Every structure is written in C-alpha cells, then in structure tokens.
C-alpha cells in the first residue's frame, strides 16, 4: 500500500519538477498558470496531464498540434517515482526519508536545468543550503548520513571554497571561465546536508563520472576539448553515490 502511495506522490512531484525545469530558466512562476504545450501554447487539459500515464496514452504527442512531446518529461517523472519508492524501501517512513525525498526533487530539477541551460538557479541552491543547515540541529536524524550542525557548517563552507578555488585558479591559468559559481553553491549545499567528509568523495566521483562520459565524445571528435560541460549533473551523481555507500565510506575512513 505504501509503495502505491509513494508511486503516486513520486509521479505528482515529478510532474511539478518538469514545470520547474521548463519555467525557472525563463524566470516564470512555477505556481501560477496551467501547463501548456511548448509548441502550440494550448493549455493542457487535466486528463492529458496525468504524470507518466498521459505521455504513454498520447504516444508522446500533443493532442492539439500533434508535435512530439520531449521525452524528458517522461524521464523526469519516472526518475521521481523511482526515487520516492527507492528512498522508502531503504529508509522506511522516517524523517530521514522525508528529507531525502525533498533533496531528490531538488536534484532532479537541478540536473536537467544544468544539463540543458548550463545554469543552476539560486532559487534552488539557496533553499537547499538553508534546509541542509537547519536539519543538522535535529539530534534524532540518521547520523550515518547527516552531520551535526558544526560539521554541517564546516561542510557548507568547505564545499563552496574548494569549488571556488578551482574556478579561481582555472581562470588565472586559462584566462577564461571553467566551472560556474552555481557549481560552488551546489557543492556548498551538499556540504550543509552531508558534512565536510562528503566533499572529497563527491568531487572525486563526479570527476570520474564526467570523464567516463566526456572522453568518448572527445575521441570521436563530437565534442571539442574547449567545449563547455555542465558539471552539476556529475556532482549530483557523485552525491547519490556518497549517500548510497555512506556506511562503507565512513567505515573505511574512520
């Protein structure tokens, strides 16, 4: 029963995530206004806006103009459903689960916005920092994953400064921008959520994953070595790996 409820909630929040992914880069309200087709601008009726199901029933096309609907909408909703179900499966009905559900929605939105627009909006990173720090004052949370407020504060500062220093020295050496401050703020948010010990692992894993995806495109020359790369998605993947293996990592280190 709980799995069905989490499935439905994941689908609903995945639909909202799609709204944020489309509207935030355009500085549009994510609360006001009904959803509409990006091609013909016709407002979408409720029966065509059922998360995941409507995409399948409409065969990925707008009912009005018959233009293809971006597959991203289905992927985001399925990812959200998977996140909700997986978090409940591993952490149960706990405050830790609730916090991780919030984080998962933020991560999905940031992932696709940065992937498409090469930006990470402050409207996403600042709330993440605040939530991450405030929750660190709760002594009843899962301390294997979440740090106390001291380590949370150190993590936030450390996460921001280490990415900021990379940006600074890269610009000094190459005389051009590398990573953006959005990446620094995202890493700061991760530091606030998971403490300073998470930062080295997240940076290492995000760099490895980025290389795995980028090197083949450099070899086949579909991407130039000077091409801009959205690093936010790789940071998020690194953070997910950290949360997934936090017990093993801390046992190994400490």
Per-region residue spans from a language model:
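Juxtamembrane boundary at the C-terminal end of a transmembrane helix
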Residues: 244-254
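Membrane-proximal soluble regions of multi-pass membrane proteins
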Residues: 17-72
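Transmembrane helix-loop-helix
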Residues: 87-99
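Generic alpha-helical transmembrane segments of integral inner-membrane proteins
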Residues: 4, 8, 12, 16, ...
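Functional transmembrane core segments of multi-pass inner-membrane proteins
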Residues: 97, 102, 109-209, 252-254
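Select subsegments of transmembrane alpha-helices in polytopic membrane proteins
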Residues: 69-76, 122-124
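Interfacial loop-to-transmembrane junctions
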Residues: 180-182, 216-241
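C-terminal ends of transmembrane helices
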Residues: 18-23, 59-67, 107-119, 164-176, ...
